[in-house]
Swiss-Prot record:
Gene name per UniProt: cmk
Keyword NADP in annotation: no
Protein name, as recorded: Cytidylate kinase
Key words, A-Z: ATP-binding, Cytoplasm, Kinase, Nucleotide-binding, Transferase
Keyword Transferase among record annotations: yes
GO cellular component, one term: cytoplasm
GO molecular function terms listed in the Swiss-Prot or TrEMBL record: ATP binding; CMP kinase activity; dCMP kinase activity
UniProt superkingdom: Archaea
Family as reported in the entry's similarity comment: Belongs to the cytidylate kinase family. Type 2 subfamily.
Provenance organism: Saccharolobus solfataricus (strain ATCC 35092 / DSM 1617 / JCM 11322 / P2) (Sulfolobus solfataricus)
Length: 189
């Protein structure tokens, strides 16, 4: 089974995806980690690489290509990504969207990154604005349209263990088509 975990910065998607992958003994791939690795190799931070990516679709294509390779190769995989739910939906069995209000996400990011709450809010707003523009421009998707997701969870008042339990309960309650996934070249988009 291939499962997508999407959501905005600070929603808990990476933590949940890692824990879920461990619970299921699935492989895990993170678009955010791939993006951060690209930023580091270019000597940039995430915000500045997002700025570069606004005019250079090759950045997103590199991330997408790496994820696409995993999706076609692996049978038991958790994909963590802001936009995988939209662009890889046809290849996956279940798409889950995690979210929380801005103030909660900012608090989580401030603690995680050891920055002020105000700086975390500023970073989130900048990243989300850049993501919205870029993903609409290059992919033609509206990241506010959550209709592609099977399950949407507000992570505000649920701890990680209960979020994972909720997802596991959902997974056990649905049946999936086990036919092989079709190959498609995502670079044709």
């Amino acid at each position: 089974m291939i499962i997508i975990i999407s959501g905005p910065p600070g929603s808990g998607k990476t933590s949940v995806a890692i824990k879920l992958a461990n619970e299921l003994s699935y492989k895990f791939i993170s678009a955010g980690k791939i993006f951060r690795d690209i930023a580091q190799s270019m000597g940039l931070d995430i915000i500045n690489l997002n700025r570069v990516a606004e005019s250079n679709f090759d950045i997103d294509k590199m991330v997408d290509k790496k994820i696409h390779e995993y999706v076609l190769r692996e049978r038991n995989l958790i994909v963590e990504s802001h936009i995988a739910g939209w662009i890889f939906r046809e290849y996956t069995d279940v798409a889950i969207y995690l979210w929380a209000p801005l103030k909660i996400r900012a608090n989580r990011i401030a603690i995680r990154d050891k920055i002020s709450y105000v700086e975390a809010v500023s970073q989130i707003i900048r990243r989300e604005y850049m993501h919205y523009k870029r993903f609409n421009k290059f992919y033609g998707i509206d990241i506010n349209d959550l209709s592609v997701f099977d399950l949407v969870i507000n992570t505000s008042n649920i701890d990680i263990n209960n979020i994972v339990k909720l997802i596991l309960d959902y997974l056990s309650s649905v049946s999936h088509n086990s036919q092989p996934l079709k190959e498609k070249n995502i670079n044709d988009k």
